[in-house]
Amino acid sequence: MSQFADFYQLIAKSPLSHWLNTLPAQLSEWEQTSQHCKFSQWFNAVERLPMLTPARLDLLHGVEADCDPPLSAGQQAGIESLLRQLMPWRKGPFSLYGVSIDTEWRSDWKWERVLPHIAPLAGRLILDVGCGSGYHLWRMVGAGAQLAVGIDPMQLFYCQFAAVRKLLGGDQRAHLLPLGIEQLPALAAFDTVFSMGVLYHRRSPLDHLLQLKNQLVSGGELVLETLVIEGDSQQVLVPGERYAQMRNVYFIPSATALVSWLEKCGFVNVRHVDMSVTSTDEQRRTAWMTSESLADFLHSDDPRLTVEGHPAPLRAVIVAEKH
């Protein structure tokens, strides 16, 4: 049986039911095609994790689960060992039965910046594009979402999400599908669509904005979080081969240019609601992500610049609505 069978059953009587015309074939192909060379190792680690039902689950203030009585030190060590097989952990943090996953990013800080500015998520059907490990999916559930669906083609992120969900008792309020946005039909079914940390990786940013729009119901809300630069509506940075050591960065607009792009794509009530400089406290090397991080990507003599001489990472949150 497909590992996505529960999701198919869940959406069969929802506004997403028409997705069943294409989705099962896509995911069946994914299950049958050659996977990343480490996928079987990652998936085996997930399979070996216990299915635990938390006695205490806090998704409102973080992603934290505990049981009563607490797990023994040996049980905790066994879970931690399996979770470490899924390194690097980039988006979090998680606190699961005494095991603290200190991820590269303090994704909870981003959530705290975003949440005050968006429509309440209670009862909403939500799509999170490029969701990574799924950390924000759980925070969306904690904020009252009816269903939070994440898409991300990275197989490690799929396994990380599956591991966390297994430790949360197989919670069906959040699902991650190993797909890219370009594989989705125009569903026009989600009340809120998030795209956080994705736009600058797209060769055609306006096409990405239109793809996001196509997933929203009329009156639905887009929450866009992305790199920006200082400047007026005409300012867009097109980095050379790399930006902060990343190869796949194509366009970094000013916040005002980004607002113009959204309006050009037909969004209404476009608001620039937050701007923050990424600090080395928010993105850093940890015991769960041991390779280079932001401190290694900034200019040694001037942290206002990347190693390539571009402006250092500055992130904006833009909120808009589909007419």
Curated annotation (Swiss-Prot):
One of its GO terms (biological process) is tRNA wobble uridine modification. Disulfide bonds: none annotated. InterPro entries: CmoB (IPR010017), Mo5U34_MeTrfas-like (IPR027555), SAM-dependent_MTases_sf (IPR029063). Its EC number is 2.5.1.-. GO terms for molecular function: methyltransferase activity; transferase activity, transferring alkyl or aryl (other than methyl) groups. Pfam families: Methyltransf_9 (PF08003). SUPFAM superfamilies: S-adenosyl-L-methionine-dependent methyltransferases. Keywords: Transferase, tRNA processing. It is an enzyme of class 2 (transferase). Carboxy-S-adenosyl-L-methionine binds at K91, W105, K110, G130, I181, E182, M196, Y200, R315. It catalyses: carboxy-S-adenosyl-L-methionine + 5-hydroxyuridine(34) in tRNA = 5-carboxymethoxyuridine(34) in tRNA + S-adenosyl-L-homocysteine + H(+). Coiled coil: none annotated. Homotetramer. Catalyzes carboxymethyl transfer from carboxy-S-adenosyl-L-methionine (Cx-SAM) to 5-hydroxyuridine (ho5U) to form 5-carboxymethoxyuridine (cmo5U) at position 34 in tRNAs. Belongs to the class I-like SAM-binding methyltransferase superfamily. CmoB family. This is tRNA U34 carboxymethyltransferase. The lineage of its organism: Bacteria, Pseudomonadati, Pseudomonadota, Gammaproteobacteria, Enterobacterales.
